[in-house]
Each structure stands twice: as structure tokens, then as C-alpha cells.
């Protein structure tokens, strides 16, 4: 594994996981609000 590639990929993976986490949290709030 190239170190430079890892340095480039890390922020992208972090941003993607943060977005997925936020979307999941919003979805859970919407689901709990309905019931």
C-alpha cells in the first residue's frame, strides 16, 4: 500500500463515514418521531 494513496483516501473515507453516520442519525430520528 502506497502511503500517499492512504493520505489521499483517509479524508475521503472519513467524510463518507461521517455523512453515512449523519444520514443514519436523521433516519432514526424520523422513524422514532413517526411511532
UniProtKB/Swiss-Prot annotation:
GO MF entries: manganese ion binding
Q: Which GO terms describe its biological process?
A: photosynthesis
Electron transport as a keyword?
no
Topological domains on the Lumenal side lie at 1-4
Spell out where the chain crosses the membrane: 5-23
Q: What's its membrane topology?
A: Single-pass membrane protein
InterPro entries, from UniProt? PSII_PsbY (IPR009388)
Stromal-side stretches of the chain, per the record, are 24-35
Task: Report the function annotation for this chain.
Answer: Loosely associated component of the core of photosystem II (PSII), it is not always seen in crystals. PSII is a light-driven water plastoquinone oxidoreductase, using light energy to abstract electrons from H(2)O, generating a proton gradient subsequently used for ATP formation.
The UniProt similarity line reads: Belongs to the PsbY family.
Name of the protein described by the UniProt record: Photosystem II reaction center protein Y
What lineage is this protein's organism placed in?
A: Eukaryota, Rhodophyta, Bangiophyceae, Cyanidiales, Cyanidiaceae
Amino acid at each position: 500500500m502506497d502511503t500517499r494513496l492512504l493520505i489521499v483516501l483517509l479524508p475521503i473515507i472519513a467524510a463518507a463515514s461521517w455523512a453515512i453516520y449523519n444520514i443514519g442519525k436523521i433516519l432514526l430520528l424520523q422513524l422514532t418521531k413517526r411511532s
